[in-house]
Swiss-Prot record:
Protein name: UvrABC system protein A
InterPro entries xref list: ABC_transporter-like_ATP-bd, ABC_transporter-like_CS, ATP_grasp_subdomain_1, P-loop_NTPase, UvrA, UvrA_DNA-bd, UvrA_inter
Similarity comment text for this entry: Belongs to the ABC transporter superfamily. UvrA family.
Alphabetical UniProt keywords: ATP-binding, Cytoplasm, DNA damage, DNA excision, DNA repair, DNA-binding, Excision nuclease, Metal-binding, Nucleotide-binding, Repeat, SOS response, Zinc, Zinc-finger
Subunit structure: Forms a heterotetramer with UvrB during the search for lesions.
Compartment(s): Cytoplasm
GO biological process: nucleotide-excision repair; SOS response
Chief location category: cytoplasm
Domain ABC transporter: 309-586, 606-935
The encoding gene: uvrA
Function per UniProt: The UvrABC repair system catalyzes the recognition and processing of DNA lesions. UvrA is an ATPase and a DNA-binding protein. A damage recognition complex composed of 2 UvrA and 2 UvrB subunits scans DNA for abnormalities. When the presence of a lesion has been verified by UvrB, the UvrA molecules dissociate.
Short name of one Pfam family: UvrA_DNA-bind
Provenance organism: Lactococcus lactis subsp. lactis (strain IL1403) (Streptococcus lactis)
One Gene Ontology MF term: excinuclease ABC activity
Lineage: Bacteria, Bacillati, Bacillota, Bacilli, Lactobacillales
Amino acid sequence: MPQDKIVIHGAREHNLKNIDVEIPRDKLVVVTGVSGSGKSSLAFETLYAEGQRRYVESLSAYARQFLGNMDKPDVDSIDGLSPAISIDQKTTSKNPRSTVGTVTEINDYLRLLYARVGTPYCVNGHGKISAQSVEEIVEQILELPEKTRLQILAPVVRTKKGTHVKMFERIQKDGYVRVRVDGEVYDISEVPELDKNKKHNIEIVIDRIVVKEGIRSRLFDSVEAALHQAEGYVIVDKMDGSELLFSEFYACPVCGFTVPELEPRLFSFNAPFGSCPDCDGLGVKLEPDVDLLIPDTSKTLREGAIIYWYGKASTYYPALLEQAMEQFGIDLDRPWEKLSEKEQQIVLYGNGDKLFHFLHEGDFGLRDQDMTFVGVIPNLWRRYRSGMSESAREMARSYMTELTCTTCHGYRLNDQALSVKVGEKNIAEFSILSIGDTLDYVKSLVLSANNEIIAKPILKEIKDRLTFLKNVGLDYLTLSRSSGTLSGGESQRIRLATQIGSNLSGVLYILDEPSIGLHQRDNDRLIESLQKMRDLGNTLIVVEHDEDTMMAADWLIDVGPGAGDLGGEIIASGTPKQVMKNKKSLTGQYLSGKRAIPVPEKRRAIDKKKMVKITGASENNLQNLDVEFPMGVMTAVTGVSGSGKSTLVNSILKKSLAQKLNHNSEKPGKHKKITGYEGIERLIDIDQSPIGRTPRSNPATYTSVFDDIRDLFANTNEAKIRGYKKGRFSFNVKGGRCEACSGDGIIKIEMHFLPDVYVPCEVCHGRRYNSETLEVHYKGKNISEVLDMRVSDGLEFFRHIPKIERKLQTIVDVGLGYVTLGQSATTLSGGEAQRMKLASELQKRSNGKAFYILDEPTTGLHSEDIATLIQVLDRLVEQGNTIVVIEHNLDVIKTADYIIDLGPEGGAGGGTILAKGRPEEVAKVADSYTGQYLKAKLEK
């Protein structure tokens, strides 16, 4: 009898307190709770980990060694478990070849569509291309200049791996004596053995001929033989390094432009057959950027306008430039922007073979010689391509920018692939449409009766996948959008759409906040998609804080009551209505409205004279915007997904300020200018990335409070008597740490076919320090015991030590009092890491001149955590600082002093300012989706 629930007994992973819980199968189940309460420990580290482990356990030991080992979660038993698929936010590919089209597999179907029903057109504007006959090929060859020496080649192997021994035997058997292998001509009996793991090109030399009168018959026979051997292809090698490719398939009769046989790999930018030869299918090329080399064009050459040469300790390049320019008659004391274009070109690209005399004594001895001036940019290329060290390459790379490839114009494919159209568009033009427009185009496509039959099953797959993407709120994306530029929420919803398309049933799906980055308007479509997956017969476990998703759930599990050691218990489990009635459940209280984040009684004053102004913002979909960000207040940038929020704030505002304030070399998005930033001293980007990537990093080291604690221990009488200095109490350096475990406190034991096991160090028993160091006590505790304290306990312990007390108080203020001082940074969630960064900022003595940028800080946060976050942000603003936050959460938006709402839609339909002003003013704008939802929130 099939089970109708998943039953967990004795779950103890991380902070879970030996919990028992029953989860109904084939339902939409939401797991919620405050940040750090144990939601992910239950959903991912217990349920998903065990589902995966059981699958891997069913494989052979041989297969398991390639898959890696899965740790068994700390749980007594789990019954009723299905195969598990995790759709989280951590697996976005940063590979530049990965796009929305490749991830969703829509590109595979598109390539098939273009290969089967595409029509080639001449790239030189001569109309449709049809197949060529032998006569047409011969006529084109005879039009070559007289006395042109030719080789007629039959390409029998094109970019295929193997030794191709049988092919050579066949060629010899057919009576041919010469072959060209990978560009080299050999006698058939002297061909070297080929590497079977490399791709090779093999052409039969059919004939060698000189263009002159009376060769038509011989040429006809040779071309016909080549077409026969190579199944429709012939290469005419003009012996001067250039070649012509002809085919019985497609070639322009006017200019000879030839398209190979239409097959799916021709339309792949990841295959040499179809990719642009100049950028190898990336669509961009790394090029030196004059704006980075010369950031201040008002400077003269002598003043160091070219920071690439003047920003170093060496005097060699400044001397080289100045002596060369003086001898070439270029004014060194004239601002760069006032030099003529010819003079600028000489500085950047050199002065050809013209010599100048160079005299310089430096690190490499005396130079006294006549030499050419190669120019700044060729010198930069040389350093990048043949840098003496990785740091030299990196330095050169910092003056370069990825620019659109001038050969394919960013389309990634070669001319042959781009010449093929279905309807009125080639495959690249198809891919740059938004998903919504792509769907409309596919539906309106008119094909011939024959092509309609061929394309019908392919178009169905494409339409289905596009519809799934539209239904999860991603209709503003394009298929050509690089995966690396997607937010965590977007990449997760793409994988969600892919899973819906797979039509699997009986699967346990575990999702991590799929609503991230999604505007309230699009929430309903996401919830419908989740319900559709459930209705296919799947169990969905969603870690989520969004109220709409919680209310739409069949079952709600609230983990708490607090975070860390104060959490790990099931506070409520039932339908949303049952949880709302549970007095112990914080989630229930927020859902029922008994608890709420208040609207501020008054907003902060906005000084119109103190504004950071961006003029002419036009990156991506921004429509030449002029935007003002008021100083000394909190501004929320809002709008539907894809409306241009991240482009405006992260690509333009943040990078422009970083360039002006920190001399950052990263190029901002397109805009005319930025003004009003003179009062800013520090730019701080507070994101959810980890505060440290190794287990050695912890809250005490990150906030630098550990330095003060080590000072305190070094000043105890016992430490002074023993001669211990501050370094004795560090677990990162030799001296005071346990050398058996190098201060880690744990030892890794490799188990080969079983997961690696971490056991406490037998010497220090997990305490990180040697016994001599642990004999030093402060108020009865040694340094290891202090690291094991919760921050809240540490605050009481170090009362009246102002330096330490102040730092620990800020960690408590951001709601992280439950974290231990020595807790590994790798165990902190994104929300916890972000709040730790805020705590670190609160510790600093503020002069009110900091500019903070936060991108969706409510990710992973419960309503109770959001209330704490808002209090922290308020404190930073009260100190006179400025905050700009990208946010969809209405509780944060309603507490902002100023709102900039972009829209009205995503992608090409967005990029304009719909509303700006106080939340109450934005709520009155009927065209603003944010305003509509905000109005309802403010009226509650």
